[in-house]
Amino acid sequence: MTTQRRKVELDPDTVERDLARLVLTVVELLRQLMERQALRRVEGGDLTEEQEERIGLTLMLLEDRMELLRTRFGLEPEDLNLDLGPLGPLL
């Protein structure tokens, strides 16, 4: 009986971009979750004005950095929205 080995085929020309896409997708998911949590806290009145300002600036900075990284790897925002099949899109 012979066992058939499965090989993972990787394209060396796109492996860096594909890895960047995966990592940036996870970071974008976390960024969106943090943004939603911050909005809930602001709407709930849980934060001081200074905290609101700091969170807002931090989220804006993170969004800017994400844009720079997407540009560096030739990715568009929609490239980070993975299709999860029957579950629908990730983001």
Curated annotation (Swiss-Prot):
Pfam families attached to this UniProt entry: GvpK (PF05121)
Keyword Ion transport assigned: no
Keywords: Gas vesicle
BP terms from Gene Ontology: gas vesicle organization
Tagged with keyword Repressor: no
Chief location bin: other
Compartments where found: Gas vesicle
One GO cellular component term: gas vesicle
Membrane-spanning segments: none
Induction: Gas vesicle production is induced by growth conditions that promote production of secondary metabolites tiancimycin A and B.
Domain of life of the organism encoding this protein: Bacteria
UniProt record similarity statement: Belongs to the gas vesicle GvpK family.
Role, per record: Might be involved in nucleating gas vesicle formation. Gas vesicles are hollow, gas filled proteinaceous nanostructures found in some microorganisms. It is not clear what function gas vesicles perform in soil bacteria.
Further comment: This strain probably produces some gas vesicles from the probable gvpO-gvpA-gvpF-gvpG-gvpJ-gvpL-gvpS-gvpK operon; it can be induced to produce more under certain growth conditions.
Full protein name: Gas vesicle protein K
Organism field: Streptomyces sp. (strain CB03234)
Organism ancestry: Bacteria, Bacillati, Actinomycetota, Actinomycetes, Kitasatosporales
Gene coding for it: gvpK
